[in-house]
Curated annotation (Swiss-Prot):
Biological process per Gene Ontology, one example term: glycolipid biosynthetic process
Taxonomic lineage: Bacteria, Bacillati, Actinomycetota, Actinomycetes, Mycobacteriales
Principal subcellular localization: membrane
Gene (UniProt): mptA
UniProt entry keywords in alphabetical sequence: Acetylation, Glycosyltransferase, Membrane, Transferase, Transmembrane, Transmembrane helix
Protein name, entry field: Alpha-(1->6)-mannopyranosyltransferase A
Length: 516
């Protein structure tokens, strides 16, 4: 007679011990000398969350604040106080990030340090109202369209009047959804669960972004290891970067899902798990089309695997890799579209970004400069000029991407370099860009751009883009005071890391640009 197995009880006890051990290690790190940047960044995140109640991308009418008699934070002196708290929090978080960056460059930070710090910095932001963007309200309204039997690719939120519509930015109320079926399904899921409750919807939607962050944390060190570069540095660039944490998680952007899925797909592909990698890339495209930039470069990676493992000839390997990748893409995308019950109408909505006019892209910046300098010499219509510069930008993108695809084909490092450059060119020359768009190239460049100059440049650019936008979602690029404050902060960030101590015992990493 056999005795009953106690394996489930043993497994439960083992899991409990593991959780206790991890929490104990996290506590020791947080309270120890290595946890200084983590504690400082946590304080900054708390200030952002507190200040966001009044100065963030708040609702038109906030019954929750009114019910606890805190609505005064949104007006007059209360708004001033909220703004001070929020901007102080941003400054503190940037200081913590730069301080951690100096430790990374000195070789004093580990991957555990990066992961633990991410958890600590993120915790307060999970409770924040949306900051630096009102997009989450549009997401909820678009999800409600699908929930209520309407096609979000055929009608804007205005076609479905409800409580969610009140907080959508006017510019987007008549705009159809420019997102893929996977994200529309996520937004529908949220609105099915919470109904038209904006607060609960915002919190649940933010939680739905967490898998993207987890995938980014998982994939980035693996890509760095595959390329022979420094995992903690890569995590510092693309995960702990306040531009990522504050905008993508604090602001609740679907870029978090897209970037996480895309990076994980790239990591799986370079490790030889090609089918799984292409599936994840396709799901990322079904969140936001930008992830599609990576797909052609991964064909080169798969081609090499077929040649090395199966002895395929170059042309045969290319045709096989391209055909199978295309087949996987079509199949996965068709399934997601069928589940969502939508077609390809979202592709036409991608042009909706032309409504945005700011200096974050070269075409729009060039149009502003030419108009400002030329209006005293000749008559020039700004919007006509803008259409011309944007058309030139699109031509630059259309010419550059195929050239980069062909140029960066030799090995895995080249393929990732090509993806990074392609995404950067798209961000710089697309008709309109927003701060969180810079998370696209950052995620891919993080395992590559690890030379001191590159790290300092990334710190400066990230700081400038972080500071130039306002917590309510507007920007300060037409205010000289705001512009020079952001520029001064960016130069300071660059200098702090450019002059930081050398890494101890760690060989300098390879810069992003490699030779053929």
């Amino acid at each position: 007679m056999t005795t009953p197995s106690h394996a489930p009880a043993v497994d439960l006890a083992t899991a409990k011990d593991a959780v206790v051990q991890h929490l104990s290690r996290l506590f020791e790190f947080t309270t120890g000398p290595q946890g200084g940047p983590a504690r400082l960044g946590f304080a900054g995140a708390v200030l952002i969350t507190a200040g966001g109640l009044g100065a963030g991308s708040v609702r038109q009418h906030d019954p929750l604040l009114e019910s606890i008699h805190m609505s005064w934070l949104r007006f007059g002196h209360g708004l001033v106080l909220s703004s001070i708290l929020l901007w102080t929090g941003v400054g503190v978080m940037l200081l913590a990030w730069l301080g951690l960056g100096r430790r990374v460059l000195a070789g004093e930070a580990t991957e555990f340090t990066m992961r633990a710090t991410t958890v600590i910095w993120l915790a307060p932001l999970l409770l924040s109202v949306p900051v630096f963007s009102r997009d989450t309200y549009s997401y909820l309204a678009q999800g409600a369209l699908l929930r209520d039997g309407l096609d979000p690719y055929a009608v804007g939120p205005v076609g479905n009047p409800n409580a969610l519509l009140d907080d959508v930015s006017p510019i987007w109320t008549i705009t159809t959804a420019p997102y893929g079926p996977a994200f529309i399904l996520v937004a529908k899921f949220v609105t099915v669960i919470v109904g038209n409750n904006v607060v609960a919807g915002t919190m649940l939607l933010r939680l739905c972004m967490l898998p993207g962050l987890a995938l980014l944390v998982w994939a980035t060190p693996r890509l760095a290891s595959h390329l022979g570069t420094h995992g903690p540095t890569a995590l510092w660039i693309c995960v702990l970067n306040p531009l990522v944490l504050i905008h993508l998680m604090g602001g609740v952007h679907n870029e978090m899902l897209m970037v996480g899925l895309m990076t994980a797909g790239i990591a799986l592909t370079v490790q030889g798990r090609n089918v799984a990698g292409i599936i994840l890339i396709t799901v990322a495209i079904a969140v936001k089309a930008t992830a599609g930039i990576a797909l052609p470069f991964l064909v080169w990676v798969w081609l090499r695997h077929l040649r090395e493992r199966r002895g395929y000839r170059p042309v045969q390997a290319f045709l096989a890799a391209a055909a199978i990748s295309l087949l996987i893409f079509v199949a996965v995308f068709a399934v997601l579209s069928a589940v969502a019950g939508v077609g390809l109408g979202w592709l036409t909505a991608l042009a909706g970004s032309v409504k945005i006019i700011n200096w974050l892209t070269v075409p729009t910046g060039a149009a502003n400069v030419i108009h400002a300098l030329g209006r005293g010499l000749f008559t020039v219509d700004f919007y006509t000029l803008l259409r011309i510069t944007r058309l030139i930008g699109i031509v630059i993108i259309a010419v550059s991407l195929p050239l980069l695809w062909w140029r960066f084909r030799r090995d895995d490092r080249a393929a990732l370099t090509g993806v990074a450059w392609s995404m950067l060119i798209v961000v710089l020359f697309v008709p309109a860009a927003l701060p969180w768009y810079y998370s696209w190239p950052l995620a891919v460049a993080a395992p590559l751009a690890q030379a001191r100059r590159a790290i300092a440049a990334i710190a400066g650019l990230s700081t400038w883009v972080m500071v130039i936008f306002k917590p309510d979602g507007s920007h300060g690029m037409y205010s000289w005071l705001h512009f020079w404050i952001a520029t001064a902060c960016a130069l300071t960030a660059w200098y702090v890391l450019y002059r930081s101590p050398d890494r101890r015992g760690v060989q300098a990493a390879t810069p992003v640009v490699n030779t053929p």
